């Protein structure tokens, strides 16, 4: 037993010496593993130096970039536009596009991401929110800044005829989340090569179920924002020309909610009043915005569904109506929610009827407005202009679309921005959620570079 213990201790000592020499001589690193949690039975598994397959050395970047200059931005662009790197970005995006997965079903997408992170030597935690990933690059200490990408596809049959069309019937990446994942992996590749320059930690969040509305909330509940002090994210835009970044300070995307009202009458003779009561309620709902909202504060209430039965000679015993509401501030948004319930219940009450209103809050169907913090927006704008030039940054208009990135922006300073994919020659002009939606892949390296520069420079600025 004593001889065996001495032999094991000798093995440990030799391992430590070997690893030390490996690091000192910059030889391929050997990863230490402990089988069965036994420190006296270590195995050595050779691991190649990361990033070599894409033509990047393990560490890239001058120490002069510890104080940011235009040369540092140019260095990131040079790394991004290496031919092997651009080709890799396209391969990754096309693989994800061919294999779309719906909310909380992104198992193969997540597997691909983890495979790429493993290849780059990037640490991560998995799973969060069922299929999500929290990876990190840098010192491992504060400050922590996050960049997020969503992973899920939509239940849409792709109508674009091209070599890499969706292989899954009835499912399609029709909102660009395949590009979002690719851009964040591209940023990870750049940041890993420049890890020795990072004055803190960059957190990479790969999030499921943006389209379902509760992916972000579940990620937060599972610790995605632990220690994080600011967060950034991008979304492709068919409005902006390829490679142009658009954003604005303050509210950028609207808060969005849905509602459904079931109208009934306890009086059997009141059935004839149900349609009249419901119709009156619809008209009154339209008056909330036109009569109560400021014309300078954009709000929307729309009734989009009305079911009053199908028989032509029998009055219904129930009428169901529903719709959506949107606003750019929390105060206006929740005022609309309150007034919708009041108007529905009071208006049908005039006709002796009752209304039960459901806002589907338990199903996470309410998104708050997505609001950009002034400081994070200004940081994004400064970094983008230094990286790409004045012509590649534009003030984006407020949009009535909604995004569950809003849940992050409610907790910490955030900046959400658009990257242009519009290219009329390619036919990349269709709105998201269209079966004809496609992107100009020239946007991929731009998004990767902006992500990387925004994150690295955020850490730099915190220490300046």
Curated annotation (Swiss-Prot):
Keyword Transit peptide: no
Gene3D superfamilies the record matches: 3.30.70.360, Zn peptidases
Keywords for this protein: Hydrolase, Manganese, Metal-binding, Signal
Reaction equation(s) it catalyzes: a jasmonyl-L-amino acid + H2O = a jasmonate + an L-alpha-amino acid
GO terms assigned for molecular function: jasmonyl-Ile conjugate hydrolase activity; metal ion binding
Chain's role: Hydrolyzes certain amino acid conjugates of the plant growth regulator indole-3-acetic acid (IAA). Also hydrolyzes amino acid conjugates of jasmonic acid and 12-hydroxy jasmonic acid.
PANTHER family in UniProt: IAA-AMINO ACID HYDROLASE ILR1-LIKE 6, PEPTIDASE M20 FAMILY MEMBER
Designated name of the protein: IAA-amino acid hydrolase ILR1-like 6
């Amino acid at each position: 037993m004593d001889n065996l213990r001495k032999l094991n201790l000798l093995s440990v000592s030799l391992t430590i010496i070997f690893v030390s020499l490996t690091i000192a001589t910059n030889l391929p690193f050997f990863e230490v593993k402990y089988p069965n949690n036994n420190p006296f039975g270590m195995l050595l598994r050779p691991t190649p130096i990361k990033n070599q397959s894409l033509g990047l050395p393990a560490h890239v970047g001058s120490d002069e970039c510890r104080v940011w200059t235009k040369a540092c931005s140019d260095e990131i662009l040079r790394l991004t536009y290496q031919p092997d790197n651009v080709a890799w970005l396209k391969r990754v995006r096309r693989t994800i596009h061919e294999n779309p997965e719906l909310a909380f079903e992104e198992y193969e997408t997540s597997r691909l991401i983890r495979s790429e992170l493993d290849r780059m030597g990037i640490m991560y935690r998995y799973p969060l929110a069922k299929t999500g990933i929290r990876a990190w690059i840098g010192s491992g200490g504060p400050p922590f800044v996050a960049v997020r990408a969503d992973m899920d596809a939509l239940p849409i049959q792709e109508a674009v005829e091209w070599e890499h069309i969706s292989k899954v019937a009835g499912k399609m990446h029709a909102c660009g989340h395949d590009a979002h994942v690719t851009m964040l992996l591209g940023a990870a590749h750049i940041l890993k090569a420049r890890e020795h320059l990072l004055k803190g930690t960059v957190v990479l969040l790969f999030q499921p179920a943006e389209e379902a509305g509760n992916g972000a909330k579940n990620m937060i509940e599972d610790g995605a924002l632990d220690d994080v002090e600011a967060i950034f994210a991008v979304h492709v835009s068919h409005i902006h020309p390829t490679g142009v970044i658009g954003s604005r300070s303050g509210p950028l995307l609207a808060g969005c909610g849905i509602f459904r009202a079931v109208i009934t009458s306890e009086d059997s003779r009141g059935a004839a009043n149900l349609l009249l009561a419901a119709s009156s309620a619809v008209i009154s709902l339209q008056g909330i915005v036109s009569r109560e909202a400021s014309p300078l504060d954009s709000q929307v209430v729309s009734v989009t569904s009305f079911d009053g039965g199908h028989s032509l000679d029998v009055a219904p015993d129930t009428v169901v109506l529903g719709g959506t509401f949107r606003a750019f501030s929390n105060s206006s948004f929740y005022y609309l929610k309150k007034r919708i319930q009041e108007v529905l219940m009071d208006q049908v009450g005039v006709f002796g009827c009752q209304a039960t209103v459901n806002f589907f809050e338990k199903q996470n169907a309410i998104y708050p407005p997505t609001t950009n913090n002034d400081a994070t927006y200004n940081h994004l704008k400064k970094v983008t202009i230094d990286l790409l030039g004045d012509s590649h940054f534009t003030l984006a208009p407020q949009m009535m679309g909604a995004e569950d990135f809003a849940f992050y922006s409610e907790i910490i300073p955030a900046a959400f921005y658009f990257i242009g994919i519009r290219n009329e020659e390619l036919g990349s002009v269709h709105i998201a959620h269209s079966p004809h939606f496609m992107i100009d892949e020239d946007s991929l390296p731009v998004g990767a570079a902006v992500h990387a520069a925004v994150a690295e420079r955020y850490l730099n600025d915190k220490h300046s």
